[in-house]
Regions:
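Catalytic alpha/beta core domains of metabolic enzymes, predominantly
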Residues: 106, 113-261
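Alpha-helix-loop-beta-strand connector modules within alpha/beta enzyme cores
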Residues: 6, 52-89, 172-192
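Active-site mouth loops of central-metabolism enzymes
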Residues: 3-29, 93-99, 125-133, 197-205
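Active-site-proximal loop/turn and secondary-structure-junction residues that shape catalytic pockets
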Residues: 8-10, 46-50, 77-79, 98-100, ...
């Protein structure tokens, strides 16, 4: 499972304050604890009205002061993403492209022929309401990727995880899309913002864990989540073992010994 740490995001009130006050220690700490908890990428999203690129530069520099975990450059503006890639000391992940506007034509050329990976959202001008429509967007994205020489193995498809409380069929459509994407392109990654599922609902951690298990069972192998949440990490390792993705439970045992989940050791 590829873990994309979600905690450095300006849409989170405490992070927004840290950005406004230029509280470097707060940002460094968020980077450090996510890296130590097992994040494979650290998502960095400024989420500011003005000066987004400058803010991303500041955030990325702070993250790189305390960890060499690759950066996930996160912005709704494709051109900002491409410029922010230049601040990273090593290739990471770009979040994101979609069929909206010219995003593919801006980001795909920037990562072509490099080790950079990319998150691709299954949407265009709006969010498709059916699995068939989302899979149609998937086909369009893959045609674009092929045209720019981007292999499927560098793409993390986001099927668009929406709030459970407004869903008519639970997560049935999302899991259908995940399974279909993996069937069409076995080497592609499927990701998603796990915590989206529980928005506006009580005891969110239970819903997040339940979603993670069901999505992984459908084929999701990447997730935007909080790696410092020990219960979530434990559930992830346990699910990998149950699905036969962890030979002899070696990853599960290793993560437990490292203290990534289970009772905290003194």
């Amino acid at each position: 499972m590829i873990i994309i740490g979600e905690k450095i995001n300006g849409s989170i009130p405490s992070v927004a304050r840290a950005i406004a006050e230029r509280d470097a220690d707060h940002i460094r700490n968020l980077a450090k604890i996510q890296s130590e908890a097992g994040a494979d990428f650290i998502d960095v999203c400024a989420s500011v009205k003005d000066g987004e690129l400058e803010t991303l530069h500041w955030l990325i520099d702070l993250v790189q002061e305390v960890t060499d975990t690759p950066i996930c450059v996160d912005s709704p503006d494709a051109r900002v993403c491409v410029e922010a890639m230049k601040f990273c000391k090593k290739p990471g992940l770009v979040n994101s492209v979609s069929m909206e506007g010219d995003k593919c034509d801006v980001i795909f050329p920037a990562i072509a022929g490099t080790p950079w990976q990319v998150v691709a959202l299954l949407c265009g001008k709006g969010i498709p309401k059916s699995a068939a429509d989302r899979l149609n967007v998937f086909d369009q994205l893959m045609e674009k990727a092929k045209a720019y020489g981007i292999p499927a193995s560098k793409i993390h498809i986001d099927p668009l995880v929406e709030m459970l409380c407004t869903s008519e069929d639970g997560i049935a459509m999302v899991t259908e899309v995940i399974a279909a994407v993996k069937e069409k392109q076995p080497s592609i990654h499927v990701t998603g913002a796990v915590s989206n599922i529980s928005f506006n609902l009580p005891v969110r951690k239970l819903l997040n864990q339940a979603f993670l298990v069901l999505a992984m069972n459908a084929g999701m192998d990447s997730a935007v989540m909080d790696p410092t949440n020990r219960d979530m990490m434990g559930m992830m390792y346990a699910t990998e073992a149950m699905l036969g993705l962890d030979e002899y439970c070696m990853e599960y045992i290793g993560a437990y010994r490292e203290g990534l989940f289970g009772p905290q050791k003194p």
